[in-house]
Swiss-Prot record:
<dbReference type="InterPro" id="IPR004389">
    <property type="entry name" value="Ribosomal_uL18_bac-type"/>
</dbReference>
<dbReference type="InterPro" id="IPR005484">
    <property type="entry name" value="Ribosomal_uL18_bac/euk"/>
</dbReference>
<keyword id="KW-0689">Ribosomal protein</keyword>
<dbReference type="GO" id="GO:0006412">
    <property type="term" value="P:translation"/>
</dbReference>
<keyword id="KW-0694">RNA-binding</keyword>
<dbReference type="Pfam" id="PF00861">
    <property type="entry name" value="Ribosomal_L18p"/>
</dbReference>
<dbReference type="GO" id="GO:0022625">
    <property type="term" value="C:cytosolic large ribosomal subunit"/>
</dbReference>
<dbReference type="GO" id="GO:0003735">
    <property type="term" value="F:structural constituent of ribosome"/>
</dbReference>
<comment type="function">
    <text>This is one of the proteins that bind and probably mediate the attachment of the 5S RNA into the large ribosomal subunit, where it forms part of the central protuberance.</text>
</comment>
<comment type="similarity">
    <text>Belongs to the universal ribosomal protein uL18 family.</text>
</comment>
<keyword id="KW-0687">Ribonucleoprotein</keyword>
<dbReference type="GO" id="GO:0008097">
    <property type="term" value="F:5S rRNA binding"/>
</dbReference>
<protein>
    <recommendedName>
        <fullName>Large ribosomal subunit protein uL18</fullName>
    </recommendedName>
</protein>
<comment type="subunit">
    <text>Part of the 50S ribosomal subunit; part of the 5S rRNA/L5/L18/L25 subcomplex. Contacts the 5S and 23S rRNAs.</text>
</comment>
<keyword id="KW-0699">rRNA-binding</keyword>
């Protein structure tokens, strides 16, 4: 039986995710910012991989935003504010296997506009 297109896309995304995830790690002073997007919501979290703890997160569902380029900037502003409160200015960006365009690129640009370096 043939694999559906949606399952194939997700399988390939997970394959990219695992390949990249083996190469990048975050620390307490330079955490890894990982994103997840669904059709309805966008999530981002800053992770300290040495301890396995989430330092800060931003949830698009709680902010009441949709997944589009303009609304994702609000999620980035929220996360940047939380990171600055923790005195974190540099991060490692983990796009989680998603292609760097559209809402992912918009999120990354908004983080840079809010003073987060990567």
């Amino acid at each position: 039986m043939r694999e559906s297109i949606q399952r194939r896309k997700n399988r390939l995304r997970i394959k990219r995710k695992r390949r990249v995830r083996g190469k990048i790690t975050g620390s307490a002073d330079r955490p890894r910012v990982s994103i997840f997007k669904s059709n309805r919501h966008f999530y981002a979290q800053a992770i300290d991989d040495t301890k396995g703890h989430t330092l800060a997160y931003s949830d698009g569902a709680k902010l009441g935003v949709k997944v589009n380029k303009e609304d994702v900037k609000k999620v980035a502003e929220d996360l940047a504010g939380k990171l600055k409160a923790l005195n974190i200015e540099t991060i490692v960006f983990d796009r989680n296997g998603y292609l760097y365009h559209g809402v992912v690129a918009s999120f990354a640009d908004a983080l840079r506009e809010n003073g987060i370096k990567f």
